[in-house]
Amino acid sequence: MKKAFITGVNGQDGSYLAEYLISLGYEVHGMVRRNSMSENQDARVIHLSDKLVTHYGDLLDSSSLNKILENVMPDEIYNIAGQSHVRVSFDIPEFTVKTNSLGVLNILESYRRICPNAKFYQASSSEMFGNSVDSDGFQRESTPMHPVSPYGCSKLFAYSIVRNYRNAYNLHASNGILFNHESPRRGSNFVTNKVVKTAVQIKLGLTDKLELGNMDSYRDWGHSKDYVRAMHLILQQDLPNDFVVSTRETHSVREMTEYVFQKLNMDYNYYVTQNPIFIRPEELKYLKGDSSKIRKLGWEPKYTFESMLDEMIEHWISYYKK
């Protein structure tokens, strides 16, 4: 039985990845950070409690990483932990860089010394591209990277150090350059779930307005369930590599908001206002990924933009009607 170790296992991607690997017959171990509200931490993985082995640890605590890897000796490592909110990275840049950059270096060092024959996946991000776009309107593996946020900068260091360790130490270490991906498990401070959750609240009379930032930024949105399948596929290859994971479609925040409100038979114009607090100091205007490289391995998304949002709408309606 293969053993997998997932950092950030109680996050959106980590929880879906754990489910997927368990369904494939893996022995799955996950790392969680101890905090004062453990019940909130475990909400996404509580249903896996009899199948998932959790370990307390932190990417900034090398001793915890060493101890976990020595105990587990995994075949596959998925590093999905980190500070994942782009707007928040402007408020806490030091923590963002420590966690997303130094934290990756820490786990790479532990991996290199303790279980170098394992395969390693790093969660990279389309935010690394910044506003760089190829002439055909896509970002791909070869597109120059010029991030426009502390988050994007932190992920670019992590991406680069993974490539460096791969070449310097002959490690099977790969990057998945994931474009935006959502689900009902997405944090409510991210724009997609914020829009869906608040729209449902408005429909049910629980609130009367939705405040957003830049509604004319475009993103390539997919579903987390599809993207964790891509993570696993990347580590099944004989040689390590870097892959863009995306839907190859782009939609604006305005389009997304309009779709959600229309599904609930409402006109968003009556409820949505712009609040400058949600606008980034430097905006990333447009993302659209060319995922041709990983599609040649047989991956493709099962969810459409619309079916993803429909699932999120249904989730929040059910949540508030309980």
Name every feature range the model reports, one short phrase each.
Residues 131-134, 184-187, 293:
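Short beta-loop-alpha junction of Rossmann-like oxidoreductase domains
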Residues 138-139, 159, 187, 221, ...:
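Tryptophan-centric aromatic hotspots in well-structured domains and transmembrane helices
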Residues 17-19, 23-24, 30-31, 57-60, ...:
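C-terminal substrate-binding subdomain of Rossmann-fold SDR/epimerase-dehydratase oxidoreductases
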Residues 37, 187, 191, 252:
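Short acidic-hydrophobic sequence patches enriched in Asp/Glu that either
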Residues 180, 184-187, 216-220:
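Heptad-repeat alpha-helical coiled-coil signaling segments
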Residues 40, 185, 313-314:
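Short Asp/Glu-rich motifs
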Residues 1-181, 303, 318:
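N-terminal Rossmann-like NAD(P)+-binding domain of SDR-like oxidoreductases, especially those catalyzing
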Residues 121, 137, 174, 188-189, ...:
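Residues that recognize and position ribonucleotide moieties
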